[in-house]
Structures are given as C-alpha cells and as structure tokens.
Amino acid sequence: MELKIGDAAPAFQSTAVGGIYGAGQPVKLNDFKGSMLVLYFYPKDDTPGCTRQACDLRDTWGEIQSRAELFGVSVDSAASHEKFIKKHGLPFPLLSDPDKVIVQNYGVWVEKSMYGKKYFGTERTTFIIGPDLRIVNILRKVKPAEHVTLLAKALLEQAAA
C-alpha cells in the first residue's frame, strides 16, 4: 500500500548516527511528536547521487534545521553511516535500516531495473511528517540535484499553512 498525504506516518525505531546522536542512539517516531520531521530515504552511502543529495542538504542545513528535524534513512549499517558523515562533514543524523523494516513500511523498497537486470533497492523519496505524526508532504523519485530546492519549497509551504 502506497502512503499518501494525511496518512499516519508508520512507526519506526532505529539507531541514529551523527548530529546530536554521536556514534549512535536509539530513536523512534514518537520522539518527534510536536515537531516537523523530514525523513529522506536514499539508496546508498557514498555513491555519487546520494553524496550530492547529502552535501546539498549539508550546505543548506541552517535553513532546514530552523524548520524541521531531518534524518537520512538507508539500509546501510551504522558503521557505514559514520564513515559517510565524517567524510562529507554532514551535520544531520542518519538512520540505519539494515533489516529493511523502515524502507518497507514506508513503501520505498521497490523493484528496480538496470541494464535489463532486476533488483530491489531504495527509491529516493522524502516524507515530511507534521507535529501530529501524519504525513503532510511526499517528494517521490526526486533527483539528487533537485532535492534541496523541492524540500525547501515544501517546508516553506508547511510553515505558511
């Protein structure tokens, strides 16, 4: 089932690495009740598109941080996240989902195809979750180069609503 705007955000529990969470602390969706929350799902640490997306978010961190809590989510390990954060100076935390529970619950673990070969992977998607823990916006299949602009616009729209 594909999530829609207005749906309750699926509950999650994971280990957050980076930002105020340091080398890793448990977090869950309910920790963010009363706050705007952005979960951006990306395929893999330290690949060209994902690095571009993360570094663009890093470069606009002040603007984003003033409007919402932000977490990147991928199926990479916490150790992989630590290396990615250090290598690129990312100021925001990343959630590790090696068992693919969060990506499946959010409907972003999908069949993909490259050079005729089918495989499963994470669809680059961002969910903006309101203070009531309901989904207020979804940016699906975003291109890394456009992500920050689309996210900033969506957050401004939420602030004006």
Predicted features and spans:
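Chalcogenol-based redox active-site neighborhoods
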Residues: M1-A161
